[in-house]
């Protein structure tokens, strides 16, 4: 059955990434309009460079191409592709139809991957340029959150069991550190992208060498000129018909790594929401459950986790594609790449938009945190109590045994009776501990159990985070708005 249907209609499937989640600017980058406009721009750049280097191309032909870059007859292109079974040649003919004087020199010396691969590389670069400031904004919002709560003690968890205290700000810095690594990795891969350039059918530049009658220097100049017109600093020296598909592995790997970071962050937020210590933003009219009106589900964090799994899973596509590219090229990369590259960036875009929205409205409940600390801190403070008793003249061994017995009794109240931890009350009631009764409040001050967490937060933000965000200073004011 032939593919059909209007992608914008209710009767046709449309990717939820485009229909529900991703930003308009990211969707446009992967649209047919942007792709085919870029093909035409590449044909223009090629013709301009060929003319400059002496090929018989007129100013009139160049001007005709310039005037029709956006004049795309998509219906004609679709009919041509149906007839020719070749998307690039369909658009060569469509462009030539509105540029009759230039029709004979469009795509001169080039192969399909001249427009296909070079356009993909332009889109990948520009897509990174959309993601980077979004990620920087997420980091900035979380950095502000961490700074404001650098001193707020909270119960730490290892194995999701109560552990030594940390601070809310320090925990947030764990999230920020991962995202900073992602920001650096995305920027590195973006900056290392190289243009495929002007290489011909199998990467040998044979067609261009023939056009320039064996002049190797002009062929190299042509490659360099088009690369510079496209805004790239370097082009591959070696290609087959395509640029190596290992580039796609690099691109999707750093996006998947970002997905892993976001999944961890949003899982933490979901767990903290269950503990009622922290919540993501919850709108006034938002409904958590159709059956349970009291529910305040962390749906934004759940969405991030859901999409992050998809983003991480996409890395298998470029890995397998690169592994099966026989010799100079096989076409079984094409259909797969049409899906995975766009989906990876639209997914990453959605995740960052959503995480920015979360980070701009995180709510903390200090009283709940304080109550949980009170439940666990007495056990954690026992070593400090023993040390204080020894300093007051007591025996370490006798004190240890007293504490052990009282701790077991308090634990039984918590676990078997569902009561509160009353260890401190038991210590206050025991005359043995009278030498330190006046010290108990000080010994149980949560801030004395957080170590250097506040200092670590401020140093980390000042020395690592703020300098990393500096290049994005002009783009920090943008707020994240979610439609759904």
Curated annotation (Swiss-Prot):
Originating organism: Mus musculus (Mouse)
Pathway: Purine metabolism; AMP biosynthesis via de novo pathway; AMP from IMP: step 2/2; Purine metabolism; IMP biosynthesis via de novo pathway; 5-amino-1-(5-phospho-D-ribosyl)imidazole-4-carboxamide from 5-amino-1-(5-phospho-D-ribosyl)imidazole-4-carboxylate: step 2/2
Subunit relationships: Homotetramer. Residues from neighboring subunits contribute catalytic and substrate-binding residues to each active site.
Described function: Catalyzes two non-sequential steps in de novo AMP synthesis: converts (S)-2-(5-amino-1-(5-phospho-D-ribosyl)imidazole-4-carboxamido)succinate (SAICAR) to fumarate plus 5-amino-1-(5-phospho-D-ribosyl)imidazole-4-carboxamide, and thereby also contributes to de novo IMP synthesis, and converts succinyladenosine monophosphate (SAMP) to AMP and fumarate.
Official protein name in the record: Adenylosuccinate lyase
Active site positions: 159 (proton donor/acceptor), 289 (proton donor/acceptor)
One cellular component (GO) term of this entry: mitochondrion
Name of the top EC class for this enzyme: lyase
Reactions mediated catalytically: N(6)-(1,2-dicarboxyethyl)-AMP = fumarate + AMP; (2S)-2-[5-amino-1-(5-phospho-beta-D-ribosyl)imidazole-4-carboxamido]succinate = 5-amino-1-(5-phospho-beta-D-ribosyl)imidazole-4-carboxamide + fumarate
PROSITE patterns: FUMARATE_LYASES
Gene designation per UniProt: Adsl
One annotated GO molecular function: identical protein binding
């Amino acid at each position: 059955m032939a593919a059909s249907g209007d992608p914008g209609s209710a009767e046709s499937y449309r990717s939820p990434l485009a229909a529900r989640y991703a930003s308009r600017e990211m969707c446009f980058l992967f649209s047919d309009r942007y792709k085919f406009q870029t093909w035409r721009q590449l044909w223009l750049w090629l013709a301009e460079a060929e003319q400059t280097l002496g090929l018989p191309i007129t100013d009139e032909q160049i001007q005709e191409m310039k005037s029709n870059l956006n004049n795309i007859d998509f219906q004609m292109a679709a009919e041509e592709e149906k007839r020719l079974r070749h998307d690039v040649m369909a658009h060569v003919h469509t462009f030539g139809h509105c540029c009759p004087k230039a029709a004979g020199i469009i795509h001169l010396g080039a192969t399909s991957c001249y427009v296909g691969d070079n356009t993909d590389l332009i889109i990948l670069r520009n897509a990174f340029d959309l993601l980077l400031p979004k990620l920087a904004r997420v980091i900035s919002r979380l950095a502000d959150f961490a700074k404001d709560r650098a001193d707020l003690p909270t119960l730490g968890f290892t194995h999701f069991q109560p552990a030594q205290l940390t601070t809310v700000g320090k925990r947030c810095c764990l999230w920020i550190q991962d995202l900073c690594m992602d920001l650096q990795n995305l920027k590195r891969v973006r900056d290392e992208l190289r243009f495929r350039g002007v290489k011909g059918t199998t990467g040998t530049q044979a067609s261009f060498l023939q056009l320039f009658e064996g002049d190797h220097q002009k062929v190299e100049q042509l490659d360099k000129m088009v690369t510079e017109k496209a805004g790239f600093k370097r082009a591959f020296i070696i290609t087959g018909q395509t640029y190596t598909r290992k580039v796609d592995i690099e691109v999707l790997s750093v996006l998947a790594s970002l997905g892993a970071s976001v999944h961890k962050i949003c899982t933490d937020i979901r767990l903290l929401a269950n503990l009622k210590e922290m919540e993501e933003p919850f709108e006034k009219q938002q409904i958590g459950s159709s059956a349970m009106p009291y529910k305040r589900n962390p749906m934004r964090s759940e969405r991030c986790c859901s999409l992050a799994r998809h983003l991480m899973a996409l890395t298998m596509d470029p890995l397998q594609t690169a592994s099966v590219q026989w010799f100079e090229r096989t076409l079984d990369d094409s259909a797969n790449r049409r899906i995975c590259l766009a989906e990876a960036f639209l997914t990453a875009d959605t995740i960052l938009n959503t995480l920015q929205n979360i980070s701009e409205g995180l709510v903390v409940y200090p009283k709940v945190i304080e109550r949980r600390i009170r439940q666990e801190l007495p056990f954690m403070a026992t070593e400090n109590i023993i040390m204080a008793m020894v300093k007051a003249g007591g025996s370490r061994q006798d004190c240890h045994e007293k504490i052990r017995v009282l701790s077991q009794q308090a634990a039984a109240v918590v676990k078997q009776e569902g009561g509160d931890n009353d260890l401190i009350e038991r210590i206050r009631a025991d005359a043995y501990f009278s030498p330190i009764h006046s010290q108990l409040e000080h010994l149980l001050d949560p801030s004395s159990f957080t170590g250097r967490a506040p200092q670590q937060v401020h140093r980390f933000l000042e020395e690592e985070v703020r300098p990393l965000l500096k290049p994005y200073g002009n783009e920090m004011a943008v707020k994240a708005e979610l439609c759904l």
